[in-house]
Regions:
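Short, electropositive alpha-helical surface patch
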Residues: 2-4, 70, 145-146
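Active-site-adjacent C-terminal substructures of enzyme catalytic domains
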Residues: 19-133, 161
């Protein structure tokens, strides 16, 4: 925890394979996020209440390793924000496909499309410590966004879980 004195908030890899106490340690030390959370009970959910620690669910890892699903719906029902990210890495989650993560959020974790969009944008930006500049379409923030192919409502985004619905992508205010 030496980084705290230099303004660095910890990120805790917690409760992926077993209930480890990592969630409570993260909250105790003011971690910006606790990540994975496949093994969570009510005690862990309660410990997150009132904290500034973002619970971050990694659906790609749970899918690839055939782990239990994090109780994202229970966390939201308890009044907690939830972030969802890909955990893109070659060992446990070899996909950075955020459209798939958004679909999994709705289909497997039972988030509404609005909750899933929030979990994969603003809440994830918070979990990375960059929500002041990224994560939402707000004056003064960096314009990183996607433009989808035409769809009549947000609910169609997670529905097309196997198709690329991105028509254009903007990074730093410029289409790429």
């Amino acid at each position: 925890m030496a980084g705290i004195k230099y303004g660095m908030r910890p990120k805790i890899h917690a409760n992926e394979m077993a209930v480890s106490g990592g969630v409570q340690v993260g909250v105790k030390y003011g971690a910006i996020s606790v990540d994975h959370l496949e093994q969570m009970g009510q005690a862990e959910i309660e410990s997150l209440k009132g904290s500034e620690t973002m619970p971050t669910v990694l659906p790609g890892c749970a899918f690839f390793l055939n782990l239990p699903l994090s109780p994202a719906r229970d966390m939201i029902n308890a009044g907690l924000p939830v972030a969802m990210a890909s955990d893109f890495n070659p060992g446990t989650s070899p996909s950075g496909n955020m459209q798939l993560i958004l679909s999994m959020a709705c289909i497997r974790y039972r988030l509404t499309p609005e909750e899933a969009l929030n979990a994969t944008t603003l809440n994830t930006a918070y979990a990375m410590g960059v929500s002041d500049e990224l994560g939402s379409i707000t004056r003064g923030k960096v314009a990183n966004l996607i433009v989808t192919q035409p769809m009549t409502q947000l609910e169609f985004m997670p529905y097309y879980y196997g198709a690329n619905k991105v028509a254009k992508m903007m990074l730093n205010g410029k289409f790429v």
